[in-house]
A protein has these predicted regions:
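Active-site entrance/lid segments in N-terminal catalytic domains of soluble metabolic enzymes
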Residues: 5-11, 23, 31
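Short, small-residue-enriched loops and turns at beta-alpha junctions
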Residues: 8-14, 43, 66
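Short hydrophobic/aromatic-enriched beta-strand-loop microsegments
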Residues: 1-6, 57-61
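Alpha/beta catalytic cores of nucleotide-metabolism and tRNA/nucleoside-modifying enzymes
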Residues: 19-38, 42-109
Length: 109
């Protein structure tokens, strides 16, 4: 697997992961290499965009840091539940029945 990241913008010249994700997906073609996206995955809507552009999963390290510091384990659990609800909501609105049926035609960019 690979993780596509720009270290949360700390590299001023780096391209945002969602901008290059379709290209990476095309280059990898039908390979078995999984793609995970990092940086800016703070909501289920962000995860939806990444999945639609070809990611197999997302990393939410920074997105759960604040809830962890404020509420501990419960804060993280609540944040993850909210993100899952947002993702499911977007999938329902766009007719994506499961995570294997995403494609970039659901986005306009």
């Amino acid at each position: 697997a690979i993780v596509v990241s720009h270290h949360h913008g700390r590299l001023p010249f780096a391209i945002a992961p969602l901008q290059v994700l379709p290209l990476i997906k095309d280059v990898l073609g039908d390979s078995d290499i999984k793609i995970f996206v990092d940086c800016g995955m703070d909501t289920g809507y962000d995860a939806y965009k990444a999945l639609a552009l070809g990611a197999d999963g997302v990393s939410v390290g920074r997105g759960i840091l604040s809830p962890l510091l404020k509420e501990g384990k419960d804060g993280v659990v609540n944040k993850m539940k909210k993100m899952n609800e947002e993702l499911q909501e977007m999938m329902m609105y766009t007719g994506v029945k499961d995570v294997k049926h995403f494609d970039k035609t659901v986005l306009h960019y």
